[in-house]
């Protein structure tokens, strides 16, 4: 038999990190996963999947993911039950995550709190100051660099980006 779940989605809120009485870390979070098809109004609906992860990975999830972070979860489906406060049996189905992949840079979601892959400023470009294209700031577009002002993909930096609400899963 096979019980395997692979999900990619965005966290609906910050992960909840707790510790068992024995000191084992456990984090819970909910992942919003877009469905592959649109409804009759042309909108893509999302499923909200509860996930649980244990030990060091739970601490990493709590430290490095936050609401809106894009994550990949690999795990298995589990159902557990307990007796609620009203005496009735409560059943919970959730994904027991074996691994969680962080699928975007730390600063990609807005707030910057560091990154696993963060490189020193100017890495890969030598000591060129703030101009990553290797030209001095006052040299203009000399020679045959092949890079004109109209080709600059970052020329609109600082201006709002036009993103439809339909493109956001939350």
From Swiss-Prot:
Keywords: DNA damage, DNA recombination, DNA repair, DNA replication, DNA-binding. Disulfide bonds: none annotated. Residues 104-170 are annotated as: Disordered. Residues 128-146 have a biased composition (Low complexity). One of its GO terms (molecular function) is enzyme activator activity. A motif (Important for interaction with partner proteins) lies at residues 165-170. PROSITE patterns: SSB. Residues 2-104 form the SSB domain. It holds the Pfam family SSB. GO terms for biological process: DNA recombination; DNA repair; DNA replication. GO terms for cellular component: nucleoid. Plays an important role in DNA replication, recombination and repair. Binds to ssDNA and to an array of partner proteins to recruit them to their sites of action during DNA metabolism. Homotetramer. NCBIfam families: PRK06751.1, ssb. This is Single-stranded DNA-binding protein. It comes from Bacillus cereus (strain ATCC 14579 / DSM 31 / CCUG 7414 / JCM 2152 / NBRC 15305 / NCIMB 9373 / NCTC 2599 / NRRL B-3711).
